[in-house]
UniProtKB/Swiss-Prot annotation:
PROSITE patterns: RNA_POL_H_23KD (PS01110). It comes from the Archaea. This is DNA-directed RNA polymerase subunit Rpo5. It is found in: Cytoplasm. The keyword Cytoplasm applies. GO terms for biological process: transcription by RNA polymerase II; transcription elongation by RNA polymerase I; tRNA transcription by RNA polymerase III. It catalyses: RNA(n) + a ribonucleoside 5'-triphosphate = RNA(n+1) + diphosphate. Part of the RNA polymerase complex. Transmembrane segments: none annotated. Belongs to the archaeal Rpo5/eukaryotic RPB5 RNA polymerase subunit family. One of its GO terms (cellular component) is cytoplasm. One of its GO terms (molecular function) is DNA-directed RNA polymerase activity. Gene3D superfamilies: RPB5-like RNA polymerase subunit.
Length: 82
């Protein structure tokens, strides 16, 4: 039986940079935008990027995307169970 090959999803040119926010950063984000955690857009725990990062439900991801006009912009996703 052949060994399963691993693919680093973050090396693909179309996959933006992801990182897990610390608890302090998460609280600051919620305070800055005056929102509750339930108001964040969601991303499923089975998403390949979430699995690759090892994020758990309840974690908040910061995603850095390229923009033709702004250079880069950040958006945030709450990891939820499937």
């Amino acid at each position: 039986m052949a060994a399963k090959k691993e693919f680093d999803i973050f090396t693909h040119e179309l996959v933006p940079e992801h990182r897990i926010l610390s608890e302090e950063e998460k609280e600051e984000l919620l305070r800055k935008y005056r929102i509750k955690i339930s108001q964040l857009p969601q991303i499923k725990a089975s998403d390949p990027a979430v699995v690759a990062l090892g994020a758990k439900p309840g974690d908040v991801l910061e995603i850095k995307r390229k923009s033709p006009t702004a250079g880069y912009y950040y958006y945030y996703r709450l990891v939820v169970e499937d």
